[in-house]
Amino acid sequence: MNNMDVINAFPGYEYIDGKNIYRGDDLGKGGYVYAEPGMYGNVALLDVASMHPNSAINLNAFGEYTQNFKDILDTRIAIKRGDFDKAKHLFGGRLAKYLDDESSAAALAQALKIAINSVYGLTSANFDNPFRDVRNKNNIVALRGALFMRTLQDEIQKRGFKVAHIKTDSIKIPDAT
């Protein structure tokens, strides 16, 4: 993982006294959270699909094994979208035999989600494990997502929309057109 590449993609980011400062906000160490209290109508809820797993892939967090992680993620997404033919050929076809009965596909997608999120979580665990990179002192995968969501907030507000809420990988925009 090259932290400098992540940081350079977001000009203005600073690590000051153990804090992730970007555009005047302390982003914390996990997912970015923002709220404008109030009651809203006609709220668009937008979700960044698999944000942390995709960040891990883009950061090449698992070195030579990153492609396997990506294949598992792509398989899960194909199953979730009902594209079973595609899913049967992904990940070297290893999961094809579990996709003959499409009624059990949701359970397989959920099992893959648990595996994917567990692996991501272990990248920043406080204990030694095969997925933890000791150089990752700042949870770089979550930081990349937080920087992206904070940038997205500014871009949406710049276009005249209110941002009511952000939580890690989702954003709520009242009266979105």
Q: What residue spans do the PLM features occupy?
A:
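Catalytic palm active-site di-aspartate
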Residues: I116, G160-D175
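A short acidic (Asp/Glu
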Residues: S55-I57, P174-T177
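Metal-dependent catalytic core segments for phosphate chemistry
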Residues: M51-L99, K113, N117, G121-L122, ...
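Compositionally biased, low-structure terminal segments
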Residues: P11-E14, D85, G92, K162
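Conserved core architecture of multi-subunit DNA-directed RNA polymerases
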Residues: A87, F91, F148-T151, E155, ...
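Common nucleic-acid-contacting/processivity interface regions adjacent to the catalytic cores
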Residues: M1-L59, A106-L147, T151-E155, H165
